[in-house]
Amino acid sequence: MSLDRRGFLKLAGFIGLVAGTACARRLAGPGSRYTTADGALEAKRWAMVIDMRRFTTAGDTQRVIDACHKAHNVPRIDDVRHEVKWIWTDTFDHVFPDQTHAHLPKALQERPFLLLCNQCDNPPCTRVCPTDATYRLADGIVAQDYHRCIGCRFCMAGCPYGARSFNWVNPRPYVGEVNPEFPTRSIGVVEKCNFCVDRLERGEVVRCAEVSAGGIVVGDLNDPESEV
């Protein structure tokens, strides 16, 4: 069957309309770029509570760090200049600088505390990103689109918690066993904790909470019946 120029343009326009409609459905909902599959875990406002009383040894914290990083193909780079991290530990004075004082118990001073992205209500990282590579979903999760990231690092400068990492080198050789359910990144891209939005869409629990033996709890901040 032959197709003249006018017929081709009509067909192309129809295909574009169908594709545009499909994309619009996929992106439907304020602040959402993810489809909601059957069985997905949902919340009005996702939140996390970390009970540090449950983390009594270095192994307790390392377990959740390893589980998170393995699930999301976070590279393990020994050079601290190129380190990439989604969840990590630091001392009390670095985690809670406003609550540090001269009479703080020594045990508290020396104890490691877990850190990760705070999923801010009004995230400065999303406001300074020129390509909309980082954005806030309607449920409060601050997500990241690696393909849109141009590596300007404005989001890193805007984040007051140091929760973002930049891939100074190709991260793929530093990923041990690749998880095929989550994309690997490339050099020149920023990344951070995404509150396991990919797992929630599959109906799976946030990975760090899953392996924390009750030390990390996630739930809906707007639901009075939620664990948080």
What are these regions (language model features)?
Residues 7, 22-62:
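C-terminal segment of N-terminal export signals and the immediately downstream linker at the start
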Residues 1-16:
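N-terminal secretory signal peptides and thylakoid transit peptides that target proteins
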